[in-house]
Amino acid sequence: MGKRKKIAERVVALMDKPERIRNIGIVAHIDHGKTTLSDNLLAGAGMISMELAGKQLFMDFDPLEQARGITIDAANVSMVHEYEGKEYLINMIDTPGHVDFGGDVTRAMRAVDGAVVVVDAVEGAMPQTETVLRQALREGVRPVLFVNKVDRMINELKVEKKEMAIRLGRVIDNINKLIRSMDEEHYKAGWRLDAANGSVAFGSALYNWAISVPQMKRTGIGFDQVYDYCRSDRMKELSQKCPLYVAVNDMIIRFLPSPLEAQKNRIRVIWKGDWNSPVGKAMTACDPNGPVAFMVTKIKVDPHAGEVATGRLFSGTLVRGMELHISGVPHTNRIQQTGIMMGAERIEVERIPAGNIAAVTGLRDAIVGSTVSSDPNMTPFEIIKHVSEPVMTVAVEAKNMRDLPKLIEVLRQTAKEDPTLQITINEETGEHLMAGMGELHLEIVATRIQRDKGVEIKTSPPIVVYRESVTGKSGPVEGKSPNHHNRFYIEIEPLEPGVIEVLKDGKIDMKMEEVERRKILIEAGMDKEEARNMVNFVGTNMFLNMTKGIQYLRETMELILEGFEEAITAGPICREPVQGIKAKLVDVKLHEDAVHRGPAQVIPAVRQAVQAGILMANPTLLEPMQYVFIQVPQDQMGGAMSEIQGRRGVILSMETEGDMITIKAKMPVAEMFGFAGAIRSATEGRALWSTEFAGFEPIPANMMLDTVRQIRTRKGLKPEMPTPSDYLKA
C-alpha cells in the first residue's frame, strides 16, 4: 500500500496542472491485448511488479474477468509518467472488447480525450476495432495506434523481414482508412496515424517490449534488430532495452491532447448549451474556478461506501460537502467523499479540479449519463448513444420467496449500474425481465446478482427480443372513449427510413428550435407539412397532429400522447415494443366539458385506435440480426459456410489473405444459440469469430404466425393473433 500511497501523492500534485494531464482509454477487439498492455503501463509507473505485468491483469480485478480471461467492465486508474524531464498524469480506462459489453466502451469514451487503439499484428483490424474506433471518433476522441503481438507474426507465421514491414504497413493503412471514412475533417487536421512521426508503436504486451520511430532513433534498435531478438528468443533482453511503457506512454503524451487542448473542441461535440454562458466558457477553458460540470459515466456499488459515481469533471472543483444539482432531479445531492480510482481501489483525496476523472460518493440520484452541476440551470450533456440495442431477454425469479423485495431492489440497482441492461418488472404477473446485449452479457449479470448482492435467483433460457412494425397504411381508424363522447381519427403508416436514422442518431429532440428540427426532418425525407405538424416522438415512432382549429385539443394533447405511448410500448401483435411507425391525428371530436374528456376517456380511445390501426396496416414482426465475422483457413471454409447457411444466415462478403478467409455474414439472433460450439466443431476449432449488432429486420412471412403464437403463449395471452375489431369494441 505504501507504494500506491506514494503514487497517489504524485497524482494529486499533478491534478492542478491540466496541461500535464492525459485522459485516455484503451480500446480494441476482444483478445487483442488491451488489459495486458494496461498492466505493462502500470508496471512502468511502479504500481505492479514488471514480472507480474501481463499475468496479474490488474485491471481485470473481478473474479469473473479472471476466470473467463476477458474484460467485462471499464476499469480506471491514475498513474504518473516522466517525459522529457517533466512528470505527467495519465488517467487510463481499460475497456472491454467483447461485443456484449460495448456499452462500457461507449461510456468510457465520454470521460476521455484520447484513445490507444490496440490491434493484433496477425489478425489486423477486426469488426469490434471498427466499432470502438467509431465510438471514439463520434465522441471527439483522438486515436493513436499500438500494434500488438508482433512476436507472433515473426515466430508463429515465420514471415520474412520484408513481408513483416508490408503486413505492419497494411495494419496502419486499414486503421487510417477507417479514420478517414468516419471523420475526414480530423483526419486531414493531423489525426492520420503515421509510424514515421511516432503516432504508432509496435510491440508485444505479453513480453513487455515496444518500439516506435522516435524510440528507434534513441536506442538504435529498429525492426531488423527486433526481428533477430524475437527469432533468437531474447525478448527478455529486448524488454529491458525497449520497455513497452516508455514507447506507449511517450506516444500518449506527445500525441493525445491535454484537457486544456481537448475541451476547446470536444465540448461542442458533447454539449449543446450556450457556449457563451458562464458554464460554457468554463468548460471550454477547463476552468477549476468555474461552475461544476461533471458527467457521470459509471456507477458501481461499494459494499462500504455505497454508490460510487465515476466520471469526467469538465469545469469547477469537486470538494466534500458540496451541494450539487443533478439533471432531471428537483433536489440537490451532497458529495460525501471525493477520490481517484486505482483499479479496484478508491483512494480519497481532498479535492478534484477540472480536467480529471473523479470517483465520488453521495450522488444517490445520479444515473449513468447524468449531468451534475453547481448551476441548477445547466443544459445537460448530450445523451450517451449506445451502438447496440438489447437483443435477448431472460426471466428472473428469486429462489426463495422471502428474497422477492430484495430482488426487485437489486434489479433496479443493477439497471442503474449498467444502462445497456433493460429491466422490466411486471407488477401484475410478478415476472421480472432482463434484456441485454447477448447470452454472455445476461449470464455475467445473473452471476453478479448472486455473488455480489447475495440473492439466489433462477433464470429462464434466453428469449430473443422482437419488435413490431407496419409495411402498409391504414385509417382513418376511429377510437371512441368509453363514455362515447370523444372520438379520435388516426392514420398509421411506416415512418421514412431516413427519419428513423435521424431519431436513432439522436439528431433531433423536442427542446430544439422548431425551425431547425423541421429542417432536419425534411432533409431526412419527410413531407414539409408533416414535419411542421410533428408533436412528439417515442423511440423511432412519431405522432403528428394534422388537424386544424379544433377546440380543446391543445389541453387534451398530453393525454392523447400518453395513449399513443401506451400503444407503442406494448404493441398489438404480441405486446413487443413498436418501431418505425407514424401515427397521424386527422380529426377529433371532443366533449366541451373537461370532466367528460379526462384520462380515463382519452387514453384508452387513442391507444385502441393506434393498436387497431397497426393491425390494419399490414403488420410485421421484426427480429434482431447480427453481423458474424469468421476468420477460417481455406480448407475449413465449407464447414463454416454450411453452419451459417443452416441458421438462416446470408453470406455478404469473403476476403482472402494468405491461406485465411474472412467471411462476413448476417444472421438472426434467434439462430445464434449454441453457435460457438457448432462453429468450433464445424471447423475443427480453427475458426476465429465475432459478432456485431446489425439492427432489426422483418421476420420471413412463413415464420410470422408461428413466432407470434409462441410469443403470445409464453406471455399468457390468447395464442391467435388479434384482429382490429378486438381493439375497437364499442
Swiss-Prot record:
One Pfam family this sequence matches: EFG_C
Signal sequence coordinates: none
A GO term for molecular function: translation elongation factor activity
Subcellular location: Cytoplasm
Diphthamide carried by residues: H596
Keywords for this protein: Cytoplasm, Elongation factor, GTP-binding, Nucleotide-binding, Protein biosynthesis
Residue ranges constituting the tr-type G domain according to the UniProt record: 19-260
CDD domains: aeEF2_snRNP_like_IV (cd01681), EF2_II (cd16268), EF2_snRNP_III (cd16261), Elongation_Factor_C (cd01514)
The keyword GTP-binding is assigned to this record: yes
Superkingdom of origin organism: Archaea
Positions with a binding annotation for GTP: 28-35, 94-98, 148-151
Main location: cytoplasm
PROSITE patterns referenced in this protein's UniProt entry, alphabetically: G_TR_1, G_TR_2
CC annotations in GO: cytosol; ribonucleoprotein complex
HAMAP family listed in its UniProt record: EF_G_EF_2_A
Family from the record: Belongs to the TRAFAC class translation factor GTPase superfamily. Classic translation factor GTPase family. EF-G/EF-2 subfamily.
Known role: Catalyzes the GTP-dependent ribosomal translocation step during translation elongation. During this step, the ribosome changes from the pre-translocational (PRE) to the post-translocational (POST) state as the newly formed A-site-bound peptidyl-tRNA and P-site-bound deacylated tRNA move to the P and E sites, respectively. Catalyzes the coordinated movement of the two tRNA molecules, the mRNA and conformational changes in the ribosome.
The protein's name: Elongation factor 2
